Structures are given as structure tokens and as C-alpha cells.
Amino acid sequence: MARLQFQLKVDGLEDESLVVRGFEGQESLSDSVWRCEPCYGFRYQVDLASALSNLTAEQFVDQTAHLTILRDGQVVQQINGIVRQLSKGDTGHRHTFYSLTLVPALERLSLRSNSRIFQQQSVPEIISILLQEMGIEDYAFALKRECAQREFCVQYRETDLQFLHRIAAEEGLVYSHLHEAQKHTLLFTDSSDSQPKLAKPVPYNALAGGEINLPYVVDLQFKTTAQVSHTELKDYSFKKPAYGFTQRTQGKDIAYQQPNYEHFDAPGRYKDDANGKAFSQIRLEYLRRDALLADAKSDEPLLLAGVRFDLQDHLDHAMNRDWLVVQANHQGTQPQALQEEGGSGATTYSNQLKLIPAHITWRARPCAKPQVDGPMIATVVGPQGEEIYCDNFGRVKVHFPWDRYSSSNEKSSCWVRVAQEWAGSQYGSMAIPRVGHEVIVSFLNGDPDQPIITGRTYHATNTAPYALPDHKTKTVLRTETHQGQGYNELSFEDQAGSEQILLHAQKDWDALIEHDHTEVIRHDQHLTVDNDRFTRIQRNQHLTVEGEVRSKIALDSSHEVGASLQHKVGQRIAVEAGKEISLKSGAKIVVEAGAELTLKAGGSFVKVDAGGVHLVGPAINLNAGGSAGSGSAYGGQLAAAPRMLAQAKPVAELVQPDIAASMQSGAARVIDVASLPTMMPSSANNTANDEPVAEEKTPERILKSDLLKPSDELEKLAKRQASAYRQGNHSDEVKLLQEALIKLGFDLGKAGADGDFGSKTKTAIEQFQKSYQPSHQTHPSYSIGAVDGIVGKGTLLALDEALMDGWVYENNIYQIWPLGKTSEKYESAGRGPGVISTGNGDYGGASYGCYQMSSNLGVVQKYIQSSKFKEFFSGLNPATKEFNVVWQDIASRYPQEFREEQHQFIKRTHYDIQIGHLRGKGLLFEHNRAAVHDLIWSTSVQFGGRTNLIFNALNGQNMESMTDKDIIILVQDYKLVNTERLFKSSPSWWSDLKKRAVSEKKALLELEIDGLEVDIK
């Protein structure tokens, strides 16, 4: 008969201080409930006795404790945790009784509540941040599926643990704990295959009354329950408004039940097919997690939650298989530990188990997402100096008042859509909220991850255009001149007797009327033109004036009539000229008067009337010589034509946006996890008119290679009618792109063409973008574009052309990595040499260029002194508007030279100095590859060329036995732990710096896996 013994050790107490009377506890995969208390992986109640009656809570609570189970003097199980609660009971003859609650360190996260925003981070990255903030370093991930980065993930009025549970369950992650002598490791998995397994099978004791000397399982009861047979999720994305986003997953092993138990839900909380497929599968696995479930009893203490084991010796051979423990309840009694209880009874241990077949994946219970009770106020933000900051969809960035971590800049939020008064296909209204505006933000379905701006408000500093309530009858639409002074305005005054419509254009007012324009003015019209006025009428002008016409022309007046000029006057015409009146006709001039005609000049006159012709003058000369007087010739000026509108085309003639051509309908129905049917456009099943489909002409395809040409989705991308492919995508099209890369000579590793766009695929795309020179034989006019690892139209056409040309990549053994690329990614997000950061909250002040050279620390000043562009900055100081304008102007005019000069300056003043500094301390890195050199570069940029950080992180290590991976982990973890000591920044920047340390560690480890050489120049 095996002899059992239980021991408990609390850090800081003598081993002999406590004896275990008994314990009860529960372990579970992820969270559960035990005795109406939450159980976060495990929870034990341990009853103790001690000869010491003066033990205090300070000696127990929040301390690490270890419960050990021994069999025949050998340790068979250890439960490591922290003491959450201590109860002190009665004192007997020799002992005082205590009871404590043992829980995982993870439970500490339940005591912190927060609201904050995570951007462009995956769930494992977010979880690691939560754990590290609490000082939990013993955790690990064993995941089969790569979790996509989340554009915008909000922890909203939740404890850290509630948030962790929620996002982990969304991605299908469950956790368990691996116990050791001095610690317990939190293990996250997404597949039963990743759970630890006992090395030896556990026997089943089927004989009542029989004895067995080894731990065993008894009372196995296997239950089969009808559950949901399939799931269907549906969602929506404004980027593909007509696309179905439907994902359907069919359950397996359901022959025993009806197949029509459907679980439908919308929205499904995803925006692409790859995530939708995974989420649908995860939802089904959760709903069916107890469809095949077994209950059993055991005295094997190794059977903890999350452990797989093989069962043997069961009379039903179907039960002799591998099982996964999803929940275990443990009991142990040790009555002989106390002398005053007479030592009656033996030490016992037993447990009750909840098991599932190990081929089934257990999913955690989904947690309700916190609902935003209603709209909230936010402020529109953007980069320093920007008044209007938006993307091609008119989305803006905002800062919420509760956000304690961001710096109220373009990194404060995701792009947030803005509701407009009217929105159609290239018609409607558009008013972009500007930086500094206060907006009302609502949330789709109450989801804090999906903000949308639904209104705008004034406040104490952003006031209305007119003072209120003095102008309460005025309705106003006033804009403000961008990067200048002034405004445009349309306002309506509704005060009785003072009604008015006011239109103010700060510069130009252009109008295009496609047909008639009718105006009726019941009173006066006044028109003042301060400069010139031009009018052009293509046909006729009709003018009727019921009263007078008065004109005053300060200079000349010219009239040119192509045909006849006719005036009819009812009474008289009076023309007066200060000097001369000239009349000239090419043929004749006829002057006719009904009664009298008079010509008068110089005291003489000729008068013609009914009485005859009268000539009066000092002398009358007939054929007496002399000459006729002459008048001035016509000198009128041609009228200048008015200028035309800059854009006179009607809206109906505008080119429709690409998104309209990419609209799809229908549903992607997933039959099993390995296949996804190809989505067909709605036009594939319905013709747009009454013409037979057979008569429609098939347009010529752009793609030409046999590999890529058959894909309709890739053809759409070639026409810029579909989105680009990037890391995190999963589809048949990605698989085709991977096959193309392999055919062109790129190595994608063991996974090969698996349809998952991972880091290997991204690296291969970047290598292709760098190395391929377009021949333009297949596609005459295109550009590959930036080296970004994204397959857009240009890269797709290049791949197609390379396949047609038979091009092969010939440098696939040791690829060359550009030194400093990782640093540039994290310093300036790869935005180029002209980028400027404001430095709000940063000890370094405003920062410049690819590597964000500091102004407060004098780095950018040193760079200017050595720059060939030095004269451009003469008399200018960094962090001023004038300096910034010159900096960005140089970047736009000389982008390559400016970038290379910055690179060489940082190499000379930071990287080379740090390499020499480390060499002087005996640390040599000549044989390390790109990942380590990028680590050194990035650290020197962030902490200075003479920093001791790398030396301190590696001090005492055996460098000869260390791998590149070891070096990266030690240095980045050192940064994470010492952030607040190393940086004189604001708390919000500390948070960003910690996030960077975690993210950069991941990026460098991925680079280390690629094994690339580095170009040190």
C-alpha cells in the first residue's frame, strides 16, 4: 500500500511551521466556477495547522506557496501558486488552525481594471503585455494558427483578466498551468495536440473490490449529447459592402443526431474570410465541446486540467484511447498530521475528472463583449501641423478622454468612419472633421472596437460662427480656409422682417448649370464687381427694362456688332461728345428727318426743312477749293472671353471608384476546415439584361501566365478592382502566389504553398520586389512599387511577367538584409527621410528622418553640420516651422540622397561606435547574422551609440554558446524590464516603449529564423 504525504511551503516561512490537514481544489482549462467562486485555471482550499498561533496575513497573502504531494517519499505532484486569502481559526491544545486559498498568479489580473486601446497587435502580443505589466514572466504560447493583427482592439471598463479571457476565447485560445517546484507556467494553446501528455498510460480498474498498487481510473461514464450541428456567421465591411462575408462550418462526428441544428449569428466580429473561417470553426467547437464527454474518478494526482493521457485495460476497447482532462476536482485528507485528533485514519487522495477524446479541441466559453452604453465625446487628432487629416474614405483619427496612453496624435486610434448627411455613389455631402474638432462617437452594435462618428459639437473654445443667443435665428454653414485665413459661408437669417440668405466665397465662386437658370427678384438687385466682369452668351440676349437704363462708364465703351445695329427711340436721341463724333460707312449714310435737318458748326449752319435748304455763314463757297474734314477711325476693343470652369464635367460622367467594381454577393460556405469554395460575383448567376449569356463577349484577361491567369480574384487585382494581399491573409489566391514564388526560385520553407500569407511569404515578396527588374515584355507599362512585402497590382503584374519570361531567382541561399531596416520600421514606420515627429511627451523632443534624430539631444544639429544640405538650413533651428518646411522640401526633392546620407550618419555616429564599444568590452559580433546587427543598430539609435544596455544585458553570459536568438531575447527583455529607468519620458510614452520592445523582439526573432546575412555599409 503506497504511503501518501502532503506538504505546504509558503515563501518566507520555515518548512516546519505548517502541516497540511487536508485540501480540496479544482483545475480547469481556462476559467470555471468552483464553490460559487471563479477558478482561473486552478483554485485550492488548503486546511493547515501550526504550532505557531501568531502567524499573520502579511506572512501569507500575496506570497508564493507550494503544495506538494508525495508517494512513498517521492514527489509526484506540485501545485505552485499565490495565496489569495488566509483564514485563521481556533487554537487547540497544541495547534492553531488556518486555511488558505491557493490560486495562480494570473488571478492578480482580476484586481486591475482599465480602459485602453491596442493597435496593430495580435492577441498573443496583447496578452503578453497584460502579463508582463503584472510581472508575470512564466508564460508560453503553443499555437497552430497564426493570430492576425488587430487594427483596433479596446479594453473597455474591464479588468485585465476579463479582457484577457475575452480576446483569448475569440481567437480560440485556452490556458492551463504547468507546475514546477518554484513556479507555474501559464500555457496558451489552440489545439489539443499542443497540450502536454503523460509518458505512461493510466490503467483502468474495472473490478469492484479489487486492489491495484498503481494509480488508476474508475467509474468512467461516457456521455453523448445532441448539440449544434453547424454554425453560420455573417458580417459586413464597408470596404466590400455587397460581399456576403458568410462563413459556414459543418460539425463532424454527428451521425448520431439530426444534422439541421444550425447556430447563426451576426455580426460575426470579423472583416475578412480568413478570420471568418477560423471564428466560425471556433464557435462550433465551443458549442460542441461537451457533445462527447466523459466523467471519471481517479487517484492519479498527475491528471490535472490540460493533461493528455492514454487509458488502458478498460473492458470496452473503444475507451482505451487518449483523453484530455478539461476539469479535475481534487481532495486530499491527512488526519494523522495532528496528535490531538488521535491520528485516526489514513492519508487519502482522489479526484473527479471531466474528460473529452483528445482529438477534440476544447474551446473556452466566449465572454460577452462590453457594450458602450451610448455615444461618447472625442477629439479629432492628427500629425503636428496638420489641420485636416483623413484617408481616402474620409476617415479620421480621434482621441477619447478616457485614453490615458496615447499622445493625442495620429496614433491615438484607428481610422474612424464619419457619418455624412447624405452618401451615395459619388454624390451626397462631405464635411471632414478637422483636427481639434469635438465629435460624437457612436459604436456599431455597441462594440467598442467599431467606433463611428455620428455628430459634431461645439465647446468652450470651439464656439459657433455667430454669438449665441444673439443670433439664434441664424442657420449657418461656414468653413475655414485650410492653411490660411478666411472662410466660405452659406447662412440663413430667419428673423421676421430680416430674412436673408448670405453666401460668402473666400476666393472663387464657380457654378455650372446644365440647363436653364431662372431668377426672379421682387425688389432691387445690386451688383458690385471690384475688378473685371466678363460675359459670353452663345446665342441671343433679350433685355426688357420697364423703366430707365442708366450707364456710367469711366473710360472707353466699345460695341462691335456683326450684322445690323438698330435702335428705335420713342421720343428723342441726345448724344454729346466732349471732342468729336465720327460716323463712317462703307457705302452710304442716310440722315432723314420728318420736319427739319440741321448741320451747325462755327456759327454757320445748313438747315433743310419744308421751306427749302438754308445755308447761313460768313461765306458760302461752292467748288472753291479746300478739303473735307476727317473724323477718327473706329478704335473699339474686342471683348475678352470669360474663363471656363476648371471642372465642367457633370458628376454623372465621373469615373466610378474601384470599390464599385469589386462588389460581390453570395456566401462563402465552408464545408470543412480544409477547403473554401471560390466566391463568384453575383453577375455569374444573373445576367444584367435579356441577352443570352452565350452572346456576351468575354473581355481579354490581363494576366497571361498559365499559373495566375485562371484566377478571377487575381484578375480583379490586376484591374485594381480588389484589395492587395498581405501578411495575415489566407486564401486560394495566396496559395497561387506562393506557387509562383516557388516556381521563380524562392524558398518558403517546410510549409510551402499552404495558402497562409506568413512571414516567409512576406520576405520572399520583398526579395522579389528588390531583385526583379521589369522587362515590360508581357505588361508594357507598370511599376512594382515599394519594397513592402505586399502584393498589389504592380507586384502581381511583375510576378506574371517573370513567369512568362522564365525568370529565376538565383540568390536563395544567403539573402542580404539592409542594415537598419528594423530600426527604421519602428522609428519612422518606414515613411521616409522627410518624416517629422512632434516629440510631445518625449524627452528627446522633436525628431527627424528615417531614424528620428533627436533635437533636444543635439543629434539632428550634428547631422546638419555634416550634411551636404547644410546651406539650406542656414540660420534655422530645429523644432521650428521654418526648419521643418526646409527639411520636408529636401526630402521631396532629393529623397534617395537624403535617405542615404541619414543612414551613413547614423552608422558612423551610433552603430559603428556601439560595435567598437562592445568590442572593447570583449563582445564580438563579426559572425552574427542580420537579426543581431539590426538589434545593435536599433539599440544604438534608441539609447545612444555609447549605451551599456547591450553589455549589461549580456554580461556574465557565455557568448560562445549563445545563439542569435538568445542574444535577441536577453537584450529585448532587458529593455522591457528597465524601460522606466532608461527613459526620461511621460507614462504614456513608457507604455508605447514597452509595446515596442515586445513587438520588435518578435520582428527580430522572425528575421533570425530567416537566417539572412547583413549588408554592413
From Swiss-Prot:
Disruption phenotype: Mutants are unable to secrete TseL.
Gene that this sequence comes from: vgrG3
EC number, UniProt record: 3.2.1.-
GO cellular component: extracellular region
Effect of residue 842 to N: Complete loss of enzymatic activity
Family of the protein in this entry: Belongs to the VgrG protein family.
Compartment(s) of residence: Secreted
The protein's name: Type VI secretion system spike protein VgrG3
InterPro entries, alphabetized: Gp5/Vgr_OB (IPR006531), Gp5_Vgr_C (IPR054030), Peptidoglycan-bd-like (IPR002477), PGBD-like_sf (IPR036365), PGBDSf (IPR036366), T6SS_RhsGE_Vgr_subset (IPR017847), T6SS_Vgr_RhsGE (IPR006533), T6SS_VgrG/RHS (IPR050708)
Main subcellular localisation: secreted
Coiled coil: none
Keywords of the record: Hydrolase, Secreted
Molecular-function annotations in GO: hydrolase activity
Organism: Vibrio cholerae serotype O1 (strain ATCC 39315 / El Tor Inaba N16961)
Gene3D superfamilies: 2.30.110.50, 4.10.220.110, Baseplate protein-like domains, Gp5 N-terminal domain, PGBD-like superfamily/PGBD
Top EC category: hydrolase
Residues the record marks as active site: 842
Pfam families hit by this protein: Gp5_trimer_C, PG_binding_1, Phage_base_V, Phage_GPD, T6SS_VgrG3-like_C
General function of this protein: Part of the type VI secretion system specialized secretion system, which delivers several virulence factors in both prokaryotic and eukaryotic cells during infection. Forms the spike at the tip of the elongating tube formed by haemolysin co-regulated protein Hcp. Allows the delivery of the TseL antibacterial toxin to target cells where it exerts its toxicity. Additionally, acts directly as an effector and targets the cell wall peptidoglycan layer of prey cells for degradation via its C-terminus. Toxicity is counteracted by a cognate immunity protein TsiV3.
Subunit-structure text: Interacts with TsiV3. Interacts with TseL.
